[in-house]
Amino acid sequence: AGHDAIMTPNPYAYLDHYQEEPEIAPVTIGGYNTLKKTYSYNPVPADADSLVKQHIIGVQANCWAEYMPTEDNRDYQIFPRLIAISETGWTPMKKKNFTSFCNRMVEDFQRLEAMGVKPCLNFFDVNINTRATQEGVLNVELETFYPGAQIYYTTHGEQPSIHANLY
């Protein structure tokens, strides 16, 4: 018994949400859903019973276009996250590997460019993640998804260069 289901949860599969900081991104409906978060989605929860698991037959990405007046806006909102949700649909969770995905994304970006698609390019940016501890210490982590990229930083407000500290 039961009904088949296509999984399309708001926190992972809505491509009309911001995928980079709202201050630098085109206006969207709201929400925040990064490439990494989209890729991390497991449509078949590990704690689901076998009856539920057998009825999960796919995933779906959603994109409401009321904040995307042009094709360039739509490209930016949809890509590269659509590639991540697609891989989620055909790859079992235990075989997914974000580092491998990022390595393959370099070629996917070249393919998108050749087709005239204008994706969000924050894949190539340095992301700054912060987390406050219970002791009141602010931890800062820098990351980029671009394979092999080196991150240089300064602590005195100057623009980093290859002569700055290597992260």
What are the residue ranges of the model-derived segments?
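Short, compositionally stereotyped local motifs that mark structural "simplifiers"
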Residues: P92, K96-Y167
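Conserved alpha/beta catalytic core and glycan-binding cleft of carbohydrate-active enzymes
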Residues: G2-Q110
